[in-house]
């Protein structure tokens, strides 16, 4: 069995400098993808979103997620909803979508409150129907690396160093 996930696509909405009003889709063509751009363009955010989508881990500088989600003050709103979707094919070629949804709310005296709204893995069954499994039914943070054919430790310490 070939331990590689392929045909990845990342959707980012409302994370750091990515606006909650726009959906940003990044394709990762085979065999190699280079992420280049000016300072502040979002290169690191793309890597952080890949890590969050695949392992559920926040970046170290995210302050419990409050600095990871687009700031409501910048959006001129009291709350911002954010989402990361990671589409990939597992080691056997079966397509999967991991969806992680968040909310950041501006409370009294400028305090920010982050909520994880949902985490879901979607796939298609033999009848072609979409099947969803939520974080309430399975440990998504362990399941996604398994579907990708690598351990969570490899993703965290080798791929997303």
Model-derived segments and their meaning:
Residues 1-142, 146-152:
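Extreme N-terminal "head/tail" segments of very large remodeling/mechanoenzyme assemblies
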Residues 158-159:
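Conserved beta-strand/loop subsegment of P-loop NTPase cores
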């Amino acid at each position: 069995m070939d331990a590689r996930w392929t045909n990845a696509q990342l959707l980012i909405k409302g994370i750091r400098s990515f606006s909650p009003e726009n959906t940003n889709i990044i394709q990762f063509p085979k065999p190699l993808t280079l992420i280049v751009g000016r300072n502040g363009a979002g290169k690191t955010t793309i890597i952080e979103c890949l890590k969050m989508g695949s392992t559920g881990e926040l970046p170290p500088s995210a302050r419990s997620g409050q600095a990871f989600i687009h700031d409501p003050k910048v959006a001129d709103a009291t709350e911002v909803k954010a989402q990361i979707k990671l589409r990939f094919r597992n080691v056997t070629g079966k397509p999967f979508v991991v969806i992680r949804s968040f909310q950041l709310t501006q409370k009294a005296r400028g305090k920010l409150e982050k909520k994880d709204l949902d985490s879901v893995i979607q796939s298609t069954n033999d009848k072609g129907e979409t099947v969803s499994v939520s974080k309430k039914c399975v440990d998504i943070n362990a399941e996604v690396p398994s579907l990708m054919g690598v351990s969570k430790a490899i993703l965290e310490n080798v791929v997303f160093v």
